[in-house]
Amino acid sequence: MKALIILGLVLLSVTVQGKIFERCELARTLKKLGLDGYKGVSLANWVCLAKWESGYNTEATNYNPGDESTDYGIFQINSRYWCNNGKTPGAVDACHISCSALLQNNIADAVACAKRVVSDPQGVRAWVAWRNHCQNKDVSQYVKGCGV
C-alpha cells in the first residue's frame, strides 16, 4: 500500500510538471508552427532564444518585482505587455491571451503570441536573452543535426 501511495505521488508530480523540450524536438515543432524565417528570424535564432529564456521549459515563470510583471512559458512572454494574468498593474494584453495559456505543453498559443511580439518594431530584440546570447552569434548549433 505504501508503495502505491509513493508511486501515485511520483506520477502526480510528473503530470503537473511542464514539458521540457529536447532541442531538435523544439526545432521541428517551431518549424511546423511557422516560425522558421518568420519576420526574418531564423529557426536557429528561435531555438537559441528558447534555450536562454526558459531552458526549453514550457512551464517556466519569472517574476519581475520592479514592475510586478511575470514572464511566462518557453519564450518568457511578459504579462506587462503581452498576456493577461489578472495581477499585473497596467497590463496591455497585446496577444489577447491568458498568461496561463503560455504554460501549456502544446506551444501553439505561445508561438502565436511570439509572432505578435516579433511583429512589433523592436522585433526579436524585445527578448533580452536573445540580445545577450544569440544576436550576432553563430546560432547554427541550435538546429545542427535536427534535419530541419
UniProtKB/Swiss-Prot annotation:
<keyword id="KW-0081">Bacteriolytic enzyme</keyword>
<dbReference type="GO" id="GO:0031640">
    <property type="term" value="P:killing of cells of another organism"/>
</dbReference>
<feature type="disulfide bond">
    <location>
        <begin position="48"/>
        <end position="134"/>
    </location>
</feature>
<dbReference type="InterPro" id="IPR000974">
    <property type="entry name" value="Glyco_hydro_22_lys"/>
</dbReference>
<keyword id="KW-0964">Secreted</keyword>
<keyword id="KW-0326">Glycosidase</keyword>
<feature type="signal peptide">
    <location>
        <begin position="1"/>
        <end position="18"/>
    </location>
</feature>
<keyword id="KW-0378">Hydrolase</keyword>
<feature type="disulfide bond">
    <location>
        <begin position="95"/>
        <end position="113"/>
    </location>
</feature>
<comment type="subunit">
    <text>Monomer.</text>
</comment>
<feature type="disulfide bond">
    <location>
        <begin position="24"/>
        <end position="146"/>
    </location>
</feature>
<dbReference type="InterPro" id="IPR001916">
    <property type="entry name" value="Glyco_hydro_22"/>
</dbReference>
<dbReference type="Pfam" id="PF00062">
    <property type="entry name" value="Lys"/>
</dbReference>
<comment type="similarity">
    <text>Belongs to the glycosyl hydrolase 22 family.</text>
</comment>
<feature type="active site">
    <location>
        <position position="53"/>
    </location>
</feature>
<comment type="function">
    <text>Lysozymes have primarily a bacteriolytic function; those in tissues and body fluids are associated with the monocyte-macrophage system and enhance the activity of immunoagents.</text>
</comment>
<protein>
    <recommendedName>
        <fullName>Lysozyme C</fullName>
        <ecNumber>3.2.1.17</ecNumber>
    </recommendedName>
</protein>
<dbReference type="GO" id="GO:0050829">
    <property type="term" value="P:defense response to Gram-negative bacterium"/>
</dbReference>
<dbReference type="InterPro" id="IPR023346">
    <property type="entry name" value="Lysozyme-like_dom_sf"/>
</dbReference>
<feature type="domain" description="C-type lysozyme">
    <location>
        <begin position="19"/>
        <end position="148"/>
    </location>
</feature>
<keyword id="KW-1015">Disulfide bond</keyword>
<keyword id="KW-0929">Antimicrobial</keyword>
<feature type="disulfide bond">
    <location>
        <begin position="83"/>
        <end position="99"/>
    </location>
</feature>
<dbReference type="GO" id="GO:0050830">
    <property type="term" value="P:defense response to Gram-positive bacterium"/>
</dbReference>
<dbReference type="GO" id="GO:0003796">
    <property type="term" value="F:lysozyme activity"/>
</dbReference>
<dbReference type="InterPro" id="IPR019799">
    <property type="entry name" value="Glyco_hydro_22_CS"/>
</dbReference>
<dbReference type="GO" id="GO:0005576">
    <property type="term" value="C:extracellular region"/>
</dbReference>
<feature type="active site">
    <location>
        <position position="71"/>
    </location>
</feature>
<keyword id="KW-0732">Signal</keyword>
